[in-house]
Design a protein with these regions (language model features):
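Solvent-exposed loop/turn segments at secondary-structure junctions
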Residues: 27-30, 61-64, 114-116, 142-143, ...
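N-terminal, active-site-proximal structural segment of metallo-dependent hydrolase catalytic domains
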Residues: 4-8, 13-48, 54, 60-65
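Conserved beta-strand and immediately adjacent loop positions that scaffold enzyme active sites
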Residues: 20, 108, 122, 153, ...
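CN hydrolase (nitrilase-like) catalytic-core segments centered on the catalytic cysteine
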Residues: 85-106, 163, 169-248
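Beta-strand-turn-beta hairpins that frame and shape the catalytic cleft
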Residues: 12-21, 156-165, 188
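Active-site catalytic loop in hydrolytic enzyme cores
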Residues: 94, 98, 114-184, 203, ...
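Cys-nucleophile CN-hydrolase/nitrilase-fold catalytic domain and related Cys-dependent amidase chemistry
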Residues: 33, 42-128, 179, 198-210
């Protein structure tokens, strides 16, 4: 396990088991997609040169997370869609795809996605060949994201390193979201985020890993955590400056099986009944 702050100087030795994840804890510039892409490319190249096979950037990284009304007071739907959002097949995302291809890595970042006349808070994972291996729209949003349409699916990606799923920021606070990904076979969850972080979040991420028997990579501009399926923190950021946090994750099928085999789904039907409301 290796935590690298600011300027990485050491590689993680290559091994045959598991895979090396680099969490890019970077603060992007609001509205400056070109600058943010250049920073992403610089840090991704450093991480890849030191053995990273999977590289992940935070929520809303490309446009600088401007879709939150606390970060951008007075934002209008029209300005957000016109100046912040990008289509998945647009020029900016093609450049990110090409970067994954160039570095021969899996590369994930968050961005405001323009799709079917709407904008989604999206995370996309490009595979080493540049294809989109995992494409997810944030499904749980609070009232501070008035212009983002909620996603309605929990996709998983089957890769040579295991089965992966993703949650975005507030999704992680909804236990059912992580659980459905685990039930669908995910053994590693990537969680690009922006909002809250700190000790309470660290504990919550450890619980999500433990209760589902999955690895978790939490990636925030001010915090990064790599956690194994037992809830142990493998690596974490130091301070709140731009940095790369690297560690090796391994998949233990026995761990996930032990967490899920005692479930009794028939007892949980009330969770999906519209008539059931919170007090």
């Amino acid at each position: 396990v290796l935590t690298i702050e600011h300027a990485p100087a050491q590689a993680i030795p290559a091994k045959e088991d598991g895979f090396v994840v680099a969490a890019l804890s970077l603060t992007p510039s609001a509205w400056d997609k070109e600058s943010n892409f250049q920073k992403l490319a610089s840090y991704a190249r450093q991480a890849a040169a030191r053995g990273a096979q999977v590289i992940v950037a935070p929520e809303g990284y490309l446009e600088g997370y401007v879709g939150n009304e606390h970060r951008t007071p007075g934002l209008t739907r029209e300005k957000y869609a016109r100046e912040a959002a990008e289509p998945l097949d647009g020029e900016m995302l093609r450049r990110v795809s090409a970067l994954a291809d160039e570095l021969d890595v899996y590369l994930m970042l968050g961005f405001a996605e323009k799709r079917a006349g709407q904008v989604f808070n999206t995370a996309v994972m490009f595979a080493p060949d540049g294809s989109a291996a995992l494409h997810y729209a944030k499904s749980h949003t609070m009232n501070d994201e008035p212009f983002n349409t909620k996603g309605d699916a929990f996709p998983v990606a089957r890769t040579p390193f295991g089965t992966w799923g993703t949650l975005i920021c507030f999704d992680r606070q909804v236990p059912e979201a992580a659980r459905i990904l685990a039930v669908k076979g995910a053994d590693t969850l990537f969680v690009p985020a922006w909002g809250g972080y700190g000790e309470m979040n660290d504990q919550m991420m450890r619980v999500r890993a433990y209760e589902n028997g999955v690895n978790v990579a939490f990636v925030h501009p001010k915090r990064a955590l790599l956690i194994d399926a037992s809830g142990t923190i493998l690596a974490r950021s130091q301070g709140d400056g731009d940095q790369i946090v690297m560690g090796r994750m391994r998949v233990d099928p026995k761990r996930k099986h032990s967490m899920l085999k005692y479930r009794r789904p028939a007892l949980y039907r009330e969770l999906t009944q519209d008539a059931v409301t919170a007090p």
